[in-house]
């Protein structure tokens, strides 16, 4: 009997608002990152961004049904990037489950990989006001002999770091991986890997780090402790930020919710979606990729008095359990097909963990210094007070590509 050997998959999402190849095989398609970038990357990336948004909504709906009264925070982009990279090593029904579950099925395999390459290239950015870092790493046992083609594609398409590791020394391997993730997320996500199962021969990690500043920062002097209404008869006290500004705002009568966008400096925007009282479930059930485009079409500039709670929440998810409920199971089973990673060993994903942290305050992300003020037209301000459960999306404007997705049920943590 062939002994099964485990792959570990760890995904770290961090937001500090203060983680059957039947198309042509195209063996030389990704020989150089430049060629990938030129190969329909932009068009494919926009299509992929829409599918990734749909996957994110589907994932939030699943998590919300399991935990109707809890906070949810995750990075759909981080999760889908890691599994897309892993799909380079999958075949047959194992590959098809990934394509179906992550909404890749309307695109060819190579279009998906070209799109991720383009997104990684565009999203990784650093300016004085904004820093986004999205990346991957493969920690491989020194004795594993992976297929060179898989390694080449993981490196050239996903820019994955390759780290040779001694999985016979599990304690030091665990420390090395946690040190790596902590470094990549600027010490925001620590101790990601709690343990490593014996028999593990490869661990795939994906991380995402985002730091930025609100285009117009909130004045800390305006922040006051106020009530947040979790449910009927239950409230918590939270520090509530306030600002009057000119914002894109809309109301969706079909889903009974108000939409407000607050931009960061650069090309990133936060969308806050506040359901009417008692309409949170209706809103969650109505989430789909088309709804985002609908909201964008409804938005118009308004002077708004906006109240936003300061936040610090952390979420950890067993993605093996969650994805299995979305029909992605073979990759975790002994009968899965990951022979494009290594034809000499039987492999399965033994563990998949996603951890994300959200911190939001007056300055934006990670407390960058600075200030700003808007010149506002003379009109009676609208009101948007996030004092009951709401949804939040952080997205890149150009695609648009959803980076983070949250349901804030209790901002006190």
From Swiss-Prot:
Site for Cleavage, residues: 378-379
Sites where a glycan is attached: 92, 267
Activity regulation field: Inhibition of KLK7 is enhanced by heparin.
Family: Belongs to the serpin family.
PROSITE patterns recorded: SERPIN
Gene assigned in the entry: Serpina12
InterPro entries: Serpin_CS (IPR023795), Serpin_dom (IPR023796), Serpin_fam (IPR000215), Serpin_sf (IPR036186), Serpin_sf_1 (IPR042178), Serpin_sf_2 (IPR042185)
Free-text comment on this protein's domains from its UniProt entry: The reactive center loop (RCL) extends out from the body of the protein and directs binding to the target protease. The protease cleaves the serpin at the reactive site within the RCL, establishing a covalent linkage between the carboxyl group of the serpin reactive site and the serine hydroxyl of the protease. The resulting inactive serpin-protease complex is highly stable.
One Gene Ontology term from the biological process aspect of the record: phosphatidylinositol 3-kinase/protein kinase B signal transduction
Function: Adipokine that modulates insulin action by specifically inhibiting its target protease KLK7 in white adipose tissues.
Region listing for Reactive center loop, in residue ranges: 364-382
UniProt KW Glycoprotein keyword: yes
Oligomeric form and interacting partners: Forms a stable complex with KLK7.
Key words, A-Z: Glycoprotein, Protease inhibitor, Secreted, Serine protease inhibitor, Signal
Gene3D superfamilies, sorted: Alpha-1-antitrypsin, domain 1 (2.30.39.10), Antithrombin, subunit I, domain 2 (3.30.497.10)
GO cellular component: extracellular space; plasma membrane
Gene Ontology molecular function terms on file: serine-type endopeptidase inhibitor activity
Secretion signal, residue range per the UniProt entry: 1-20
Expression across tissues: Expressed in visceral adipose tissues.
Name of this chain's protein: Serpin A12
């Amino acid at each position: 009997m062939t002994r099964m050997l485990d792959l570990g998959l760890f995904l770290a999402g961090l937001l500090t608002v203060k983680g059957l190849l039947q198309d042509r095989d195209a063996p030389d398609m990704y020989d150089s990152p430049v060629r990938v970038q030129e190969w329909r990357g932009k068009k494919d990336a926009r299509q992929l961004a829409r599918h990734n948004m749909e996957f994110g909504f589907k994932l939030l709906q699943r998590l919300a049904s399991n935990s109707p009264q809890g906070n949810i925070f995750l990075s759909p982009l981080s999760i889908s990037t890691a599994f897309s990279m892993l799909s380079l090593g999958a075949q047959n029904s194992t590959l098809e489950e990934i394509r179906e579950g992550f909404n890749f099925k309307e695109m060819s395999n190579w279009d998906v990989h070209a799109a991720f390459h383009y997104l990684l290239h565009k999203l990784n950015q650093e300016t004085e006001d904004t820093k986004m870092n999205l990346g991957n790493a493969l920690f491989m046992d020194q004795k594993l002999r992976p297929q060179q083609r898989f390694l080449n594609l993981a490196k050239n398409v996903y820019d994955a770091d390759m780290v040779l590791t001694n999985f016979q020394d599990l304690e030091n391997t665990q420390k090395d991986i946690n040190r790596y993730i902590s470094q990549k997320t600027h010490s925001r996500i620590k101790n990601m890997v709690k343990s490593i199962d014996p028999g593990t021969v490869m661990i795939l990690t994906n991380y995402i780090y985002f730091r930025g500043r609100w285009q117009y920062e909130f004045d800390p002097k305006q922040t006051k402790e106020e009530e947040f209404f979790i449910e009927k008869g239950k409230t918590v006290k939270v520090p509530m930020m306030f600002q009057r500004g000119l914002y894109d705002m809309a109301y969706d009568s079909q889903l009974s919710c108000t939409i407000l966008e607050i931009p960061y400096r650069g090309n990133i925007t936060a969308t806050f979606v506040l359901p009417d009282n008692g309409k949170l479930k209706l809103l969650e059930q109505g989430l789909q990729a088309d709804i985002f485009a609908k909201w964008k079409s409804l938005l118009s500039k308004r002077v708004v008095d906006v109240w936003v709670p300061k936040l610090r929440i952390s979420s950890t998810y067993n993605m093996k359990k969650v994805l299995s409920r979305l029909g992605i199971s073979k990759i975790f089973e002994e009968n899965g097909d990951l022979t494009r990673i290594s034809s000499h060993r039987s492999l399965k994903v033994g563990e998949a963990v996603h951890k994300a942290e959200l911190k939001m305050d007056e300055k934006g992300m990670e407390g960058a210094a600075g200030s700003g003020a808007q010149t506002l037209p003379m009109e009676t301000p609208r009101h948007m007070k996030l004092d009951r459960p709401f949804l939040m999306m952080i997205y890149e404007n150009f695609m648009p590509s959803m980076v983070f997705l949250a349901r804030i049920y209790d901002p006190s943590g």
